Amino acid sequence: MCSHSQRVLPKRIILVRHGESQGNLQPTAYDTIPDPKIQLTPEGIAQARHAGHRIRHVIAGEGSTNWRVYFYVSPYARTRSTLREIGRSFSRKRVIGVREECRIREQDFGNFQVQERMNVIKETRQRFGRFFYRFPEGESAADVFDRVSSTHFFFNYCNGFLESLWRDVDMNRLNHDPSDDLNLIIVSHGLASRVFLMKWFKWTVEQFELLNNFENGEFRVIQLGSGGEYSLAVHHTDEELLEWGLSPDMVADQKRRASASKGDWNDPCSWYLDAFFDHLPDSDDDNVDKHDETDSLSECS
């Protein structure tokens, strides 16, 4: 077993959305079927199986023979079925293990979802804002963000999924041989995957709301770059990132991460600076101080 000082980082973290479900094909299915019990359609099964082939090609395509996979899966029927189909592409010796993880489940839309009511609710969400709007008797995207990352509930500290994932890696709970490339595959839902990316890359709410949802059976590859930073741009093209809704600044940030040295790279966070400090002058502190003194004198005269 690896000691904490021998921490071996995953080479890839792959986020997968489930295949087409009954609810995707016919939204009225939610009127009578609980969301966690919604099944895949035949097309969804085919999409999931194809995703497995493509994911294996991503992992094995670089020529390495020393690689293993570990799966995390949402407890919903459609994600569990997606995992079973993806798993057909991997032999048992390649799979370290699998864990059902409730914190990466679908956003709670409020029990049975009668379509006439949901249409009104979703129109209200568009006006209110997709991230902060909380469905009646359900969750907001911000609530999903909290359980995917971490949060405090009164005096009880609740670990988010991402925090638990890193603790698994740190303590080698995955029983991973450090000589093998480790690939973590997270089979989940569109929103849970997008807030995972938001947390990972420290994106703002405004940036999150630019993102397009994953297609059914689609995946994103977060891969370790040459300098030790994770990035979407190691595997994916600029065109793909733009198509998924990333702004040009966000794409440029991913490209920096892909080649930056972990010790030298600092997050420039230009979007934070521009959002909060666009009114500040570019001159040095001395000139700013003199300007402030002049303003003070003029106010006193």
Residues of each region from the PLM?
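Active-site-proximal alpha-helix that buttresses catalytic centers in soluble enzyme cores
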Residues: 2-94, 137-143, 148, 301
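Beta-strand elements within well-structured catalytic alpha/beta cores of enzymes
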Residues: 12-16, 72, 178-192
